[in-house]
Amino acid sequence: MQLNAKANKKKKNHLKIIKVVDGDGLIVENIFNNQEFEIRFLGIDAPELKPCRKLIQDERETHLAAQFLMELGRKSLKYLLEIAPPNTNVSILVETENEIDLYGRTLAYVFLEDGSCLNEIMIQEGFAKPYS
């Protein structure tokens, strides 16, 4: 996965995963001030877990049944829980011009302590697709 070389970025360290929401979303906490916020993985899209407008759109685009897509969403969530369960320490990299989405979530590249990027892993392992 290539980061946008032109975008200004800032790094946030000292975060701990509180909850894995789905295959491309987390709730994290700053370990110093206990501030919690939701992260949406930047540049990827994992299958949905429940019926919604996005699921209908994905069903139309992929020609796959909603139930099958939601099963893929559950597998994506399960995999992310295996590699980054609650209490895992992470850091994030955000593009300053594209930091918050319409739902108030922080858009970010998420990194484990060993430097591996969760966004990239989810794509490489087939649990998400690139999204722009």
Which positions does each model-derived feature cover?
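Small beta-barrel nucleic-acid-binding modules, primarily SNase/OB-fold domains
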Residues: 1-132
